[in-house]
């Protein structure tokens, strides 16, 4: 399967399966060149711009987190996003390993308004 990353900031919303990656990749370099920190609120997405921010909402619980996209993946056909350990923990996905989520890109300016 081929993915073509978005080259501009545009609205994006999708529902699909999230997974998480943790200890095995902790300390490894991400696609952005940053070092992966399983305790940071980050995620890997196949097409969202690096860097960008997304709100990820677990459809079952309604819990939401905001993550910074700093890596590419997941490269498993049925997966939409790979969350850091801590993001998955906050969404309640650690024990099951995966779960259905909605991913919405946060456009520039919106994040600023949230944290004023």
Regions found by a protein language model. Give the residues of each.
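Secreted/periplasmic proteins
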Residues: 1-116
């Amino acid at each position: 399967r081929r993915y073509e990353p978005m080259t501009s900031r545009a609205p994006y919303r999708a529902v699909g399966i999230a997974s998480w990656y943790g200890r095995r990749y902790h300390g490894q370099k991400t696609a952005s060149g940053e070092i992966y920190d399983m305790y940071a609120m980050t995620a890997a997405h196949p097409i969202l711009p690096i860097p960008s921010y997304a709100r990820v909402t677990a459809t079952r619980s309604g819990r939401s987190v905001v993550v910074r996209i700093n890596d590419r993946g997941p490269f498993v056909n049925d997966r939409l996003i790979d969350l850091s350990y801590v993001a998955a923990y906050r969404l309640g996905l650690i024990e099951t390993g995966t779960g259905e989520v909605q991913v919405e890109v946060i456009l520039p300016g919106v994040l600023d308004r949230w944290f004023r």
